[in-house]
Amino acid sequence: MTLDHLKLFRDVVLARNMTRGAEISGVSQSAASQQLQEAERLLGVDLLDRRTRPFELTEAGRLYYEFCRDVLRRKEEFDRQLDRLKGRVQGTVRVAAIYSVGISDMARLELEVGARMPEAQLLVEYLRPEKVYDAVVTDQADLGLVSYPESNREITVIPWREDKMMVVAAPSHPLAAKKKLAPSDLAQRDFVSFDDDLRVGREVKRYLREAGIQVNAVMHFDNTQTLKEAVILGAGISIMPVRVLRNDIEQGRLVAIPIKGCALVRPLGIIHRRRKTFNLATQVFLELLRQEAAAELPAAGQLVAR
């Protein structure tokens, strides 16, 4: 059996689905089934209990899964140590990120990676939050960038940064001329919100409820890009993370106004599989992320464009 066979079994187990595991490993579903049947024939035991949906691991299957995982981790560690001996930063950094992490920030990081690690490759895929977690758990991504990160038995969290949230409005909106808003200024205003299935949407709704403010919810979206465009076009105001709107604010397309006494922030974190061994390129990229988070941002007042 080859490393590819071990990886296939690990991927199938993590995905809890034969078709999905085969897709992650880059083989067809029929080829994956044949490889697993061949492994069972060589080992002389059943690895999967196929009578249940989703399938369950047999006792032998659990032992084999631990073996596959340990061998693949040792291979990752070997590659990392070999890179160190060569004194070269090589390899691929696979990142899964939510759409609103800040594409301009990621573009700057990609340029920095190219300058510092010309022999390394950075691959970034933008996904919905639950898909980012799935990509990390199934080892399609080395790192995930998410808001309101949560750890579990498979995933650990590295705190990254906190994005200040403010009211955003089109420059022509009546509130745009104010330097600071009282919570009551938002009452009965047309409001464009994030979907409730997004944590950021629920947190904004909680803030408004606790402040005793009723807004006129006119639209809701599942991504920052569409939401900000609705605000720019005058559909209403919103409360959004300001960092990802810097270009629009600097270009005069949006105005950001702080709310008195509002400490609402959107925490962002870096997630990865527990006991994950990173290649040298990924370690350098992690350090770049930390440096990027530590970079000083303009003060709130400087972000308000009129």
Describe each model-derived feature in a short phrase.
Residues E40-E59:
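A short LG(V/I)-centered, amphipathic sequence patch enriched
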Residues D11-S28:
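Short helix-boundary/capping micro-motifs
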Residues D105, V255-P298:
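A late-sequence structural motif
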Residues L42-L43, Y64-K86:
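Alpha-helical linker/hinge and terminal dimerization helices associated
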Residues K86-R153, H220, L303-V304:
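Central regulatory/effector-binding core of bacterial HTH transcription factors
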Residues R128-Y133, V137-A141, V146-S147, R199-I257:
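Hydrophobic hinge/microswitch elements
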Residues D190-A211, F278-T282, L286-E287, E292-V304:
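Secondary-structure junction motif
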Residues N152-M165, A169-F191:
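Flexible hinge/capping segments at coil-to-helix
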